[in-house]
């Protein structure tokens, strides 16, 4: 099992959900964020008690950005040949098997990953053990 190269603790500062202003009042206004541009907009003018706007202060530490809590960066893998790319970077990146990969290929990917000493985050997904009767 590869040990992550990252020694710094991964800390997510804040996880505010930025929703579009007035999306809670009107059905036609969806929740996905849009920057308010109106001349009288309370959100744009940053009044107290209104929807928060995303800004630089919500970003995480540059050194730990995109890292998972296990200390690795995620790399989506569809087959064993894509897994070979992680051979030299197994202390920085971990593999995540894509959702549309069959059980047969999943077994091959997990087996090859153990040979290459690459961490697989979802190694048990869709792999069931069958009992012989």
Curated annotation (Swiss-Prot):
Record's keyword terms, sorted: Ribonucleoprotein, Ribosomal protein
| GO cellular component term, pick one | cytosolic ribosome
The keyword Transmembrane appears for this protein: no
Query: GO: which molecular function terms?
Result: mRNA binding; structural constituent of ribosome
Biological process (GO) annotations held by this record are:
translation
Q: Which CDD domains match?
A: Ribosomal_L32_L32e
SUPFAM superfamilies tied to this protein: Ribosomal protein L32e
Which family is it part of? Belongs to the eukaryotic ribosomal protein eL32 family.
Protein name (database record): Large ribosomal subunit protein eL32z
Q: Which organism is it from?
A: Arabidopsis thaliana (Mouse-ear cress)
């Amino acid at each position: 099992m590869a040990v992550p190269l990252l020694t710094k603790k991964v800390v997510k500062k804040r996880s505010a959900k930025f929703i579009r202003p007035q999306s809670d009042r009107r059905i036609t206004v969806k929740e996905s964020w849009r920057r308010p541009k109106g001349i009288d907009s309370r959100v744009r003018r940053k009044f107290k008690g209104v929807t928060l706007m995303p800004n630089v202060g919500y970003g995480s530490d540059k050194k730990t950005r995109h890292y998972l809590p296990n200390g690795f960066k995620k790399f989506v893998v569809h087959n064993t040949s894509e897994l070979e790319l992680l051979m030299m970077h197994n202390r920085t990146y971990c593999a995540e098997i894509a959702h549309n990969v069959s059980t047969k290929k999943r077994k091959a990917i997990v087996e090859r990953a153990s040979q290459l000493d690459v961490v697989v985050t979802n190694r048990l997904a869709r792999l069931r053990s069958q009992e012989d009767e």
